[in-house]
Amino acid sequence: MNKLIIFFCVVFVLPCLAQNDRDLRKVRNLKHEAKFQKMSAAELKDYETKLMRQVADLALIPPEINTSPLPEYDYDTQHYVMSLTIERTPGGRIWLAWIGECDCPSSYLLAASSDDNGETWSKPRLVIDGRSSAIPIQRTVIIGNFWTDPTGKLWLFFDQTLNHFDGRGGLWAITSDNPDDENPVWSAPKRISHGAMLSKPTVLSTGEWVLPSYLLQNEGFGPFKGTFPELDPYRGVNVLVSTDQGESWKLRGIRTFPNPDWHEAMIVEKNDGQLWMTARTRKGIMESFSPDKGYTWSEPDFTAADIQHPSSRFFVRRLSSGRLLLIKNGAALHKHEGRNQFSAWLSEDDGKTWKGGLVIDDRNKVTYPDGFEAPDGTIYITYDHNRGPGEIALAKFTEADILAGRLVSPQSKLKMTAVRPLKKKK
């Protein structure tokens, strides 16, 4: 009898229940369709925007700081590298970070360290990966920068957003008071502002810290386009300032640029007290000046020194000698051939003229330089070569090398390999 009951249920009852369920879902779907059919175009757009704003809020969830990333993120699992940042701690450790997977919505951040001036490097020892199979659109950690502040604390700034850029972005930071220890302790992630940043902060003569964040002059990628219209007045380079050693950051000024791209702006303080901002555009490097520590900015223009550069990241930084350092694509100051070759230049007049022209890498497909100056005057520059399946490269040189146009310092080395992915991309 029990077998007959089970047979009856399987053959007759369950199909009926399934059909009833399908019928109910069909009715519900028709009701939903009717609801949308009654909406005007403006009402539909408003509905979509509200929905995408809820999805975008997934980027507001603090990411996990993974300090035990092996073996999941070992080099034999990696097939792509995009250079982000390099920095030295007070104890002499060098930290390096890069992007894995791709320059796309699936990217994540990895970091390694060196205790012998960049001769050898650890395996990945810190990873920030916002991806999750439980969310409808990919969460992206796409750019970042290490910076040692005047107190000796190491910062790692990074961007967490959705779908590469959701129209809002998100600049986050973690810090470590013991970055030279065997197991550094990192603070909980703190969201600083909308937008992102790829350049180190600058400490002004006033003691203020200036951070060149940027909110893309773009409404958002893909389904997020137009999701945050209230942020449109803030699109451009957002000059964030801290007067309390990074406890808080406040927006001081905004500078937009024509032909905008990923701004990747840099700020240095000139000897006359003005701030000099340089930024990436689709037409090359443009500049703007602030006479009041970042509140107001001049209309942007191409550099007075006629620095020719592709739409790609460059590097400008004040050295301890007082000179400015420039790292650019191309072997000549007034010429480039796309994202090929890197050269180093020095300025003794706050960027009006440049000397040197040391070619630190003569290969094609070299991009995204970042660097620092060690206490002994050695300049360290990291960048990527042939992103996937390429390498994160490192150059060590001095001001004397730049002025000579060749290596004259015994400790200088070029085209060193810091990170190389070992997995073959399918």
Region locations from a protein language model:
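Asp-box/BNR beta-propeller blade signature and adjacent active/binding-site loops
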Residues: 20-426
